[in-house]
Structure formats: C-alpha cells, structure tokens
C-alpha cells in the first residue's frame, strides 16, 4: 500500500506522538501530508499545532484547524444525553462521543483536498482505533487507512524519543505537563497509565486537573436552575447560551463544587480490561437534571423502555458505532420520547454531590397531585385497586389451585 498513497490526512494534535507520525508518514510513504486539528474544547492553544506542522514541512494550505465545539455539543453530546447514556453503569462516554465527529471531519477534508488516505495516532490496543476507522469507512469506504502504531517498530518511549531526536522534532516537555496519558474535550478529561495501571493504587490528588477535591470545595452549597426544551439544555439560571457555552458553564460549576470525578475499570471493545480516571463535571450535573425532568414528563412505559434500551445505545457509542443504522434507529425512538421533555430543574451542588430539589413543566408534566395525594380526593376511587390486583394475580391464583408452589 505504501506506493499507492499519494496524499494522507493526519489527525494531528501538535504533540510529540502525532509529530513523529507526521514525519514517519513523509519518510515511509513518501506522500503529501495534510494535517487536521480539531478544537472540541480540549482547552489548549491550537496555533502551536500550525507552527509545528509548518516546521515539519507541511504547506500552509494543507493545515486545517477547525472549531467544532458547538457542533460537538449540539449534534453529539446533547443527543447522547437525551438517552441518559452510561457505559457499564458509570462511564459518561466523554472520549467515545468525540471520535465520530473527528473521523467525519477528517474524511470530509480528505474529500476536499483529494486525499486518498487518512491516518490516526491510536494504538493497536485501544478502542479509539475502532472508533476512528469505523467513522472513516462510514463516510468513504474507499479511503486507505494508515495506523502507524500497528505498522512501525517504535514500540517504546525510548525508540520514539530517539526517532524524534534523529529527525529534529522538538521533544521538550511543556511546563506543568502531566505524566499521565490524557484526553480532554468539552465533556470530560481522562487519565490513564503509570500508577493507574495498578487498579489497587489510588490516584494522587495532583493528577486531577479540572476539579476541586470535594473536601476542598466550598462549604456553602449553590442552587442552580436548568431549563430544557425537547430534552436539550437551553439555559442556566435563565441565561441562554450556545451549546458549547452551556456545557462550559456547567463544567465551571461542577469543578467548583468537586463534582464528576470517577475511577473505574472498564471492558474495552478489543477484549481487555482498562483502568481509567475521569472528570465529567458538567455532564454529571446534566444527567441528573435530565433524568429529573423525565420523571415528571415521560410516560411510565416510555421511560422504562428507554432504560432498557440505554445500555445497548451506550455500548454502540463506546464501541464506535455512532454512524450505524442501529444507533440511528435508537436515536429516532429516543428523540420521539423527548417531545414533551420541556421544563425546569432546580439543583443543589455541594461537595461532590448533585441533589435535585425541584422539577416543573408548565405544559408537559404528568404529575397530578389530585391523584397521588395522601389527603381526601375526589378523582380516584381506591376500591378500584382491588380488581386491578385480582386481575394481575390471576396467574398466581390458577397456579395455586393446581397445587404449584412458588
């Protein structure tokens, strides 16, 4: 394949690994390289990536830096939160949900520039290789895919550094750079590697980059109100913001109060178990509020069906199937359930906790105090319950009369 590739679009961060990949592609494939850097809210200055690419011989017209923050939240994060998606009961899918957008945009740039190949920096052990490549092939099945970590022999940090030094690639560490393997976007930041590879070893406090420790969070709680329309967040404390602005604001609130830290061992799609630590402050608040709103606006059976389907939906995202027909089918059902998910939720934030203290919907609430009151009412005849119970017990009654014991 090396002689067949003429132009490749590389998912490029400007960091050491992808800079080495850039040079390796030039040397091994002797092809033209286009770099694509996505701004999905990782909180880093992206212009250095442009300068780094230029220093490695990339033409100015072959450098793409795109601000995808609003698209990321509006078209990926919000649809996922309509489903209340959680993988294996805990993980809010912060890395998983970012990969489809990057892959789609990378494939679009390949089409725009006439590139016949794409490349990424995911290793052969992780989930990201699957997520990226399923995304590429969903948009262009004819694209050639170059995954250097599955091809080269630079399989240690020492070999990577030696390669970088040999080719004049800057290997100086940024001041304050974490030794952990990290991935960040507007939804979360993740940490892997080093002491975390021992699941019995507690992470150091200085690992956490975003949030205060709950122990150091303010001693006073904070009350906030979130407004939703059709299941999506539209305002915080009455202030309407862009999708990216809303999630940024929620992150600020969550970090201030020590909300959203997670330490888990998860089952990777490729078959191994992996330990990761995550901070998802805004997403943790959003999930709690959205479920509270659904508690008054969704029909019982619709809510229960959603809960049954959610693990499948979450697994599809985790495993890289965002663009699959089955995910889109589930999304259509989920979105239909959100037509009446309109209203306001009041929350109290305090030392790592998110507590629902109120929920209301002017036109879509199914909560009717007249039916559920403990006081005297005129709308519900309690005698009707006897027949309801007897009908539901009929199979037990028949079995009992036949001598069957439970």
UniProtKB/Swiss-Prot annotation:
This is Argininosuccinate synthase. L-aspartate binds at residues 123, 127-128. It comes from the Bacteria. Belongs to the argininosuccinate synthase family. Type 1 subfamily. It is found in: Cytoplasm. Pfam families: Arginosuc_syn_C, Arginosuc_synth. One of its GO terms (biological process) is L-arginine biosynthetic process. ATP binds at residues 11-19, 38, 121. It catalyses: L-citrulline + L-aspartate + ATP = 2-(N(omega)-L-arginino)succinate + AMP + diphosphate + H(+). Its main location: cytoplasm. The keyword Cytoplasm applies. It comes from Campylobacter jejuni subsp. doylei (strain ATCC BAA-1458 / RM4099 / 269.97). Homotetramer. Keywords: Amino-acid biosynthesis, Arginine biosynthesis, ATP-binding, Cytoplasm, Ligase, Nucleotide-binding. Pathway: Amino-acid biosynthesis; L-arginine biosynthesis; L-arginine from L-ornithine and carbamoyl phosphate: step 2/3. Its EC number is 6.3.4.5. One of its GO terms (molecular function) is argininosuccinate synthase activity. L-citrulline binds at residues 91, 96, 127, 131, 181, 190, 266, 278. Gene3D superfamilies: Argininosuccinate synthetase, chain A, domain 2, HUPs, Single helix bin. The gene is argG. SUPFAM superfamilies: Adenine nucleotide alpha hydrolases-like, Argininosuccinate synthetase, C-terminal domain. GO terms for cellular component: cytoplasm.
